[in-house]
Amino acid sequence: TNETVAEHREQILAGGRRFKYPRQYARHKLVFNAIIIIIVTILIAAVIIWWQLYPAQNTSTFFYRLTRILPVPVATVDGAQVKYSDYLMSLSGSQHYLQQSERLNLDSDDGKRQIEFIKRQALDGAIADTYAEKIAKEKGITITDKQVDDVIASSLNTVSGRISQDVYDDSTLSTLGYTSDEYRHIIQRSLVRQAVAYEIDTKAASAKKAAESLIAGAKNPSLITLSKQLQSKGYDASIGASGLVPKTNHDGGLTQEAMKLKKSQVSGFFRSTTGDGYYLVQLVNSTDTQLSYNFLRIPLTMFNQQLKTLAENKKIQEYISVKQTSSEIIRR
């Protein structure tokens, strides 16, 4: 029939076109094969990366650099992803310090125990920092470059004198293995956590307000008396003594506040630069290079308590297996 003849004719022409344009058909096949190869390669690479990061927990410099490019999570906290790179950054600094400064063999029994310790510390720290950043965004809390600069500037003062920024950067690289940009990132995250901890801790703020009222109603109450009065009202407060320390001592800003005082004088409340609470200091003694002081501390507790509550409510999910140790920040 005419239809059968037409079909045969089309088949013959199609075959002719294939012989007439062989390069076109070959090119299409090459493109198709190339796409298949690329997809398979990507899948294989993804499986290898997944295996190395999660089951194997590879902490090498290569995978640390890789996680800075690929934003893969190591955990989630209250719906926020904890970056694997932040965990590895903290862990690498601790490992570098143990190897270079403490000369610890990480393959020894003691070294393996230390690794478990700093792994938990690094993971809990990364989780806490991420949760702090989440709250900071909600409350509009920001940290400026100047605040980071001020922290670094205060660290340039040493017992033997003030060092240069270059010497400080070289020391950070040698001791912890961090570049200046990496260390600035760590400082920025710690400042965010501190700012959030102070912002949300209504208990500590109430204790501070109560202490200020007690101070105003009495003539120079001793720190011991003030601490007991706060404790009797149900507030958390503790006292302590520094002993003789150099005036360049890095202790959360307590020495620097004590330097402003006369003997036996008590400061007003201030926030420690380590973000662990509100302090009063009383100067005990001072020389040209050293001083000693007593202090009263009202600790911050609500941030860590919120993390504990999240853990209890299964709102913290960890994607790698890390043992619980005494270093844990999040008490479970």
For each feature predicted by the language model, list its residue ranges:
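Short, low-structural-confidence N-terminal segments
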Residues: 1-113, 253, 260-266, 275, ...
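N-terminal short leaders/motifs
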Residues: 12-34, 213-239
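Alpha-helical transmembrane segments of integral membrane proteins
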Residues: 32-36, 116, 120, 185
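N-terminal targeting/tethering segments
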Residues: 61-178, 182
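FKBP-type peptidyl-prolyl cis-trans isomerase
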Residues: 69-97, 136, 192-196, 226-231, ...
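Sec-exported extracytoplasmic/periplasmic mature domains
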Residues: 92-99, 123-142, 148, 153-164, ...
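Proteostasis/folding factors centered on peptidyl-prolyl cis-trans isomerases
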Residues: 169-198, 252-297
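Peptidyl-prolyl cis-trans isomerase
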Residues: 216-257, 285-292
